[in-house]
Amino acid sequence: MKHYEANFDGLVGPTHNYAGLSYGNVASLNNAAAISSPKAAAKQGLKKAKALADLGLAQGMLAPQERPDLHTLRRIGFSGTDAEVLNKAAKQAPALLRACCSASSMWTANAATVSPSADTHDGKIHFTPANLVDKLHRSIEPVTTGNILAATFNNSRYFHHHQHLPEHVSFGDEGAANHTRLCSEYGHAGIELFVYGQEATNPNAPKPKKYPARQTLEASQAIARLHQLDDESSVFIQQNPDVIDQGVFHNDVIAVGNQNVLFYHEQAFVDTQKKLAEIQDKFNGKELHFIEVPTAKVGIQDAVKSYLFNTQIVTLPNGEMAIIAPTNCQENEAVYAYLNELVTLGTPIKQVHYFDVKQSMQNGGGPACLRLRVAMNETELAAVNPNTLMNDELFNRLNLWVEKHYRDELAIDDLADPQLIVESRTALDELTQIMKLGSVYQFQK
């Protein structure tokens, strides 16, 4: 039986904007109030996803969230018609309106944590949506995320969907952005690496001083329990608090893994050598490649600006690994030099492919942010909603859909335009028909 690691990319929503909502994310803050292009952003994302499908990889798409989120605005006291709710929020609480208009669900690395059937006791693929409690604009996503995941992976024989963790900072969970999996083959049992920023219940444990640690050890342990993982298939690693304070808000900004390769920065973790030894021990003597990037070659700021580690490492059909990198990596002298050297070092990584995802990058999300990885066998892949899998037909339909419904430009002041509600809902209603998702949105209930 064939085994794959499918990437499910987030489709950029119609309200993609630069509101600077993500404290701790340097790119997000630096581009606050810039004019965005929802149409360009969506097309850049689709182009990247289609390119991976054309490389022979399993590739799907996840639908965006409904924005503006009038349901949340009504929950916090704004009343009247939809237009009146929007108008009141714009005048009385513009920051809350911006939070309720974010298209941040496009970064599906934060949508959920996924454990494949090879690792779980019941032999099913487990999904737990991330609660994302650290950021208001993302904390309103999990319920709809769960709906979309259930409509995409819609066969209970193969897929087990959990509710998101309790909505409290002690269980702060940011999903797959703080999780990676090492294995010899996608279909073999692997080691799941859970990276956390702090221990919520231990006030004496190290934690960052400037920026928040969004993932807790307690959340990571809860996910491992829910997903029926045993101790031998789980490793819990603390991210270096110092790099969080330098803008490394998720682990996928400082490390990335694929099969038997862990690619990480020298400063990424606490107790690095001890944890690498634990991984090696649990890998039972099979070949592992730890690729450590020294600070002397790539500093933390260059890593963050270029998103060197927010790249995707994929295994091509010929068995070689390739890095899927943003063009920003080409534009950074130190990073570009390192990547050119990397492919000559005798590791499994032999190629680098560059993609323009600047609309996403300016909001603080690179190629790895845009995808949720799901390792599966051919039977499980066949059980996925076929209308969510990338091919020529879906690519063309979604591009036409974007062209029809998305604005070329969107300024922050445009978020108060009632017409944006109509445009967004019309687009999403049509999208649920294209992808055959059913009624996953609040306005469709």
Swiss-Prot record:
Keywords, sorted A to Z: Arginine metabolism, Hydrolase
**InterPro entries membership:** AstB_sf, SuccinylArg_d-Hdrlase_AstB
Q: Which is an annotated GO molecular function term of this record?
A: N-succinylarginine dihydrolase activity
Assembly and partners are described as: Homodimer.
In terms of domain of life, where is this protein from? Bacteria
In which pathway does this enzyme or protein participate?
Amino-acid degradation; L-arginine degradation via AST pathway; L-glutamate and succinate from L-arginine: step 2/5
Organism of origin is Shewanella loihica (strain ATCC BAA-1088 / PV-4)
Enzyme class of the recorded protein, top EC level: hydrolase
Q: What is this protein called?
A: N-succinylarginine dihydrolase
